[in-house]
Curated annotation (Swiss-Prot):
It is found in: Nucleus. This is Protein DROOPING LEAF. SUPFAM superfamilies: HMG-box. It comes from Oryza sativa subsp. japonica (Rice). Keywords: Developmental protein, Differentiation, DNA-binding, Flowering, Metal-binding, Nucleus, Zinc, Zinc-finger.
Length: 194
């Protein structure tokens, strides 16, 4: 598969900042002009010039790019296209740049996800042999019945030294005039059996 059209010539240039090899398609009509090349990794600008002043054409083996610099043969009679950059550091070679995928941004879980996770854990702690599907269904019903912004209350009675959860988070505002309704079905069952 050829990525360069016949009216362009493909040259390879090494970025002077990050040392990445760049493939540059230079139009044949622009081979006599200086071409600006922008690196896709570090956004450094390099300049590609076909005939720098007072420099003889280099062979591909003499060029600092080594095997990556290919001769420009399509439009210029087998002369290589050297790279000229004002910030060239040929004395200090750098390690090749490794392209890494961007890291995913970790977001905090939503209120719904936090509630569901905690509720399923509570239900499974109270009833360890309940299937996850049923625990999820119960947690979803509890989400629909309660206001997740309020926390659950724990009450202690004098007759029982162990604390038990007897009421769910406070219901929505439209239920505020009614009695507080327990929304944790599993705890209702525990109270009846206990």
């Amino acid at each position: 598969m050829d990525l360069v059209s016949p009216s362009e010539h493909l040259c390879y240039v090494r970025c002077t900042y990050c040392n990445t090899v760049l493939a540059v398609g230079v139009p044949c009509k622009r081979l006599m002009d200086t071409v600006t090349v922008k690196c896709g990794h570090c956004n450094n600008l390099s300049f590609l010039s076909p005939r720098p002043p007072m420099v003889q054409p280099l062979s591909p083996t003499d060029h600092p790019l080594g095997p990556f610099q290919g001769p420009c043969t399509d439009c210029r009679r087998n002369q290589p296209l050297p790279l000229v950059s004002p910030t060239s550091n040929e004395g200090s070679p750098r390690a090749p740049f490794v392209v890494k995928p961007p890291e995913k941004k970790h977001r905090l879980p939503s209120a719904y996800n936090r509630f569901m996770r905690e509720e399923i854990q509570r239900i499974k702690a109270a009833k360890p042999d309940i299937p996850h599907r049923e625990a999820f269904s119960m947690a979803a019903k509890n989400w629909a019945k309660c206001d997740p912004r309020c926390s659950s209350t724990v009450s202690t009675s004098n007759s029982n030294p162990e604390p038990r959860v007897v009421a769910a988070p406070i219901p929505h505002q439209e239920r505020a005039n009614e009695q507080v309704v327990e929304s944790f079905d599993i705890f209702k069952q525990m109270e009846r059996s206990g």
